[in-house]
């Protein structure tokens, strides 16, 4: 209940009104004036409207130009650059400032003697140095690049901040020149893209020394054994390796492979399984296509046997008709090996590294199987689909013969890799086989 507080105004009970020019005096009985205290008003269930975010005007980032150079006019900036007044990272931002004023690299070179290549190196090097400062790197590390550090920092420009700090420390500790810094940066940047390469798992990606060691280790495998170049690269890889695992991998390569490993390498050279990468839009642009039923490797033999054996296209529209219903199909271009298969089926695997001995990318693949060719031949150049624990797997003909296996689920005809934007390679090379 609300309590009301009445207050009577103490004005006169008479008031005057003017009617047709005459004053009329009549008593007026005023109603009490009521005030309601705010404490007695019940709170509303409605929430107050959210506060709107106030408009924040654009504030440009702080100028990279040191305070002592900010008041300079154009002539003053040119004078500082021409005379190299100050440290390189202090006057480097002046070059960008002149660009915004309409100067070009050739005109700046003519006025200051700084070539276009050096201008770019100074600008980028200063930006890399700023990222090291903002990352909280040790002051002594930053100071190591105060003199002639632009070229070194320019080389690590493509690395992220964490990698830049690690690379900068490695460069300082080992006294690298520009070429050494560039090799180190490329080794760190390239390491993740070498997924599946031989020996990659023996090197630590988080250590610049191991990244550089792996690059040298990988290059050594491009040369025949024995050779002076190969030995030199492996010795350098051993010197730069940090972890014990990486050192052992390099030592194994340096001291030579065992006879068993050599035999295995020779066997790999005769593999005849074609491997292709499907390109975006290739199916749509193909003059002919092949439709195949699809099974997952983990579904096992039972699912494979259920897949339709007979299917063909006909009629004016090329409608595909199968002997039984099936839920999963794949459309492939009319490649000759696939067209030649009469009773084919496609088996999907989730990780290519666990299927065939190649330098896989950890991606899904589709394996085309010829179900008419089930007899196993003692040849390492052929692969066959066989039953395995938890599904199906691929194995060499010679290995199966040694195990006493004479019949398989079918022979491998083709391995198809999925389309990728960053991979222009359409067929796997012989040297990519592990």
From Swiss-Prot:
Record's GO cellular component terms: chloroplast; chloroplast stroma; plastid
The organelle targeting sequence, given as a residue range: 1-51
Transmembrane segments: none
InterPro entries in the cross-refs: RAF1 (IPR037494), Raf1_C (IPR040858), Raf1_HTH (IPR040781), Raf1_N (IPR041358)
Function summary: Required for assembly or stability of RuBisCO. Acts at a postchaperonin step to fold and/or assemble the large subunit (rbcL) into RuBisCO. RAF1 binds first to a rbcL dimer (rbcL(2)), leading to a rbcL(8)-RAF1(4) complex formation. In the next step, RBCS displaces RAF1, thus resulting in holoenzyme formation.
Domain writeup: Has 3 domains, the N-terminal alpha-helical domain, an extended flexible linker and the C-terminal beta-sheet domain. The N-terminal alpha-helical domain stabilizes RbcL dimers and RbcL dimer-dimer interactions, facilitating RbcL(8) formation. The C-terminal beta-sheet domain probably dimerizes Raf1. The 2 C-terminal beta-sheet domains are swapped and pack against each other to form the dimer interface.
Name the UniProt record assigns to this protein: Rubisco accumulation factor 1.1, chloroplastic
The organism of origin for this protein: Arabidopsis thaliana (Mouse-ear cress)
Classification lineage: Eukaryota, Viridiplantae, Streptophyta, Embryophyta, Tracheophyta
């Amino acid at each position: 209940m609300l309590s009301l507080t009445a207050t009577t105004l103490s004005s006169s009970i008479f008031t005057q009104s003017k009617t047709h020019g005459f004053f009329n005096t009549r008593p007026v009985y005023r109603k009490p004036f009521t005030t309601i205290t705010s404490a007695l008003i019940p709170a509303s269930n409605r929430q107050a409207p959210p506060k709107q975010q106030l408009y924040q005007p654009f504030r440009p980032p702080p100028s990279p130009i040191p305070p002592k150079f900010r008041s300079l006019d154009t002539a003053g900036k040119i004078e500082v650059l021409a005379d190299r007044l100050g440290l390189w990272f202090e006057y480097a931002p002046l070059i960008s400032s002149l660009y915004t004023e309409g100067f070009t690299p050739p005109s700046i070179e003519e006025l200051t003697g700084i070539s276009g290549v050096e201008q770019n190196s100074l600008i980028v090097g200063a930006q890399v140095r700023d990222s090291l400062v903002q990352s909280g790197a040790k002051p002594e590390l930053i100071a190591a690049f105060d003199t002639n550090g632009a070229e070194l920092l320019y080389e690590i420009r493509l690395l992220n901040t964490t990698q830049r700090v690690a690379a900068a420390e490695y460069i300082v500790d080992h006294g690298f020149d520009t070429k050494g810094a560039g090799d180190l940066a490329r080794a760190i940047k390239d390491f993740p893209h070498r997924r599946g390469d031989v020996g990659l798992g023996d090197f630590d990606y988080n250590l610049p020394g191991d990244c550089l060691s792996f690059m040298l280790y990988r290059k050594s495998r491009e040369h025949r054994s024995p050779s002076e170049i190969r030995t030199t690269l492996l010795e350098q890889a051993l010197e730069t390796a940090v972890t014990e695992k990486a050192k052992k991998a390099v030592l194994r390569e340096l001291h030579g492979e065992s006879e068993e490993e050599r035999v295995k390498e020779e066997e790999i050279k005769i593999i005849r399984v074609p491997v292709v990468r499907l390109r975006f839009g290739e199916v749509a642009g193909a003059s002919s296509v092949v439709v195949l039923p699809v099974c997952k490797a983990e579904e096992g033999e039972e699912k494979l046997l259920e897949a339709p054996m007979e299917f063909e296209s006909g009629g004016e529209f090329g409608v595909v008709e199968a002997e039984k219903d099936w839920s999963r199909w794949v459309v492939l271009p009319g490649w000759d090996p696939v067209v030649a298969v009469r009773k084919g089926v496609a088996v999907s695997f989730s990780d290519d590294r666990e299927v065939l001995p190649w330098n896989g990318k950890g991606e899904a693949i589709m394996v085309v199987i010829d179900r008419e060719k089930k007899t196993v031949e003692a040849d390492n150049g052929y692969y066959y689909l066989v039953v395995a624990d938890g599904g199906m797997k691929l194995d060499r003909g010679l290995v199966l013969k040694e195990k006493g296996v004479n019949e398989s689920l079918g022979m491998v005809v083709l391995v198809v890799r999925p389309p990728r934007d960053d991979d222009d390679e359409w067929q796997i090379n012989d040297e990519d086989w592990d």
